[in-house]
Amino acid sequence: MPDKVAKGHSRTILIVAGMLTLAAGMPLGISAQTRKSRLPDHVPPKRSSQIKNGFGINSDLPRDPYLPWSRWWWTRIFDAGVSWIRIGQYENSSEPTSWDWVEQKRGVYSISPEVEDYVNSLTDNGVKVQVQLLYGNPMYTSPAGRLPDAITPEPGSFHNDDRSLYSVFWPPKTPEQIEAFTNYVKWMVNHFRGRIHYYALWNEQDIGYWNPWGNPEEYGRLLKAFVPAVHETDPEAKVIYGGQADPTRDFTKRALDTCQCAAGIDVYAYHTYPGYGRNLNPETMDSGAYGKESPRALREIVRRYPGIRPDIEYWDDEFNSIGAWKGSDDSVQAKYIPRGMIYNWAAGVRTFVWLLTAGTDGNEFDDFGFIHGLRYRPDDFTPRAVFYSLQNTNALFSDTKFDPSIQIPTPDLAETHPAKGTPFLAYGFRSPKGKAIVAYWLAAHSEPGNKFPADRIGLKIVNSGIKHPVLIDIVSGEIKPLAWKEGTTDVLDSVPLLDSVLAITDEDYFDWPVLPESPSSLTVTAASGGAQLKWEIHGGNPSGIEVERQVAGDGADSAPWKKIAQLPGSTAEYSDTTAPPSSRVGYRVRASNDAGESAYSNIVRLTF
């Protein structure tokens, strides 16, 4: 992430005075009252396995001792309905998928068995993976006059800017260095063929992750070699123009001019942290946060660049606005994240939020994690409020498409509210089944302490097809029934207006089954006559627990998984006495209920 975001109905509004909130309730017609008992009271979660095309998250891979796989954080990816993940950085350092880990001796490439398990856990549980291929390797890219023949990766506490002699932020620049890097790229793409399909070149190459500082011509020359290295190794693989830190059009244009490979780029990625270090609302990404630059203008120059694919995708693959920044807190973050995600979604941009869980041995403490990291405190590995905002956004808006035919005219409002002049944003989307959902909010600067003066407005929603409207608070997940104004099918007399996303949809929108949360914290120990397994059970009313075992041959962890036990849903341990001797055995568990199965737990292994 950097040391420093979408197009819809944006109109200036004038707001009726008042202090009513969603929690204070709303007038309900008779039909709304009779429907209330049929509605869920909160947004039912949707798991990753239930989503085809949704939002993404960045995550460090598990790493002891600060991000142990045996704690309850990793499986929350699947429980929260995350559809995509971006891996390749441990905080602001390198990861076991990085060049300096994969090639530690010249010409010798390897991935640890643990990383294989992490990647398989993601893909087996329905998450699509993009991996960043980065950074330099001191055996090739160090400016030293004498280069080592072997290296040991540095601990995860290092970070940019780092111009020390053997820093990994010295990039490949010479033909020999570029050839060495593309050898690593080809090996990675071939190794993960069939499991990983998206490969990004570098991370924030326009700032201090590229020594001595971002250089578009140098990046363009590396990109020119990267594109064929990926596509020729795996014709099904996709190339990502690695996430640019700032929406600077000149950097992108110069890189593409040098590369002359525009037709080979499948995804263009950039990052947004409007007002980095201070509270600045996400919509300013296109209206002042970056001066004359903006993500919208950046996408336009890419779209018009000669040779660019007409179907190129745009990803904002790092976005956050954290509570630790000046003038902010966790309540502000919980509002801003859905606002940014939906603002992007309406523009056809997929958002990957930064970051799942903080590795606190990095250089940014616990600041960015949607789940707290290890600080030896009671709330270690517990979610911040923003995690539930993310989960609700995933459940409601994943797999939807922006529908410009759904119109939400600007409400006719008075001039007495403190936020007068603030843009009102409203977007209509449709699910794969054609069901409409509308998101609306006031694009205001949110204050710490959830102090926004809430109001009520009349709202007209044209061409939605919604018959029995309900109101959803994205931050809290609360659902309440509404009723159309008598004699109309598109006018709501009085709905809340907030600085957080509210959604209106039909009462039958929530048509997905609620699967159990995944068991977590699986451990295995050798016991008399076998293996002793223990795990933690979570929500979703599990009625059963399935235990699966993998017996690996010849040291490989690619053998099929087989179910060895079906247990009652409250069971949290199991003793396996049937594992074959002299074998390496893996275990995983999942929960089930009448609706289906959860994601799998973490994987544990034991050698008999």
Predicted regions and their residues:
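Aromatic/acidic polysaccharide-binding cleft in carbohydrate-active enzymes
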Residues: 323-418
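Glycoside hydrolase catalytic-domain groove-lining segments
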Residues: 273-326, 350-359, 379-383
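Carbohydrate-binding surface patches
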Residues: 412-465
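Beta-strand-rich modules
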Residues: 576-596
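Substrate-binding cleft and catalytic face of glycoside hydrolase catalytic domains
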Residues: 80-283
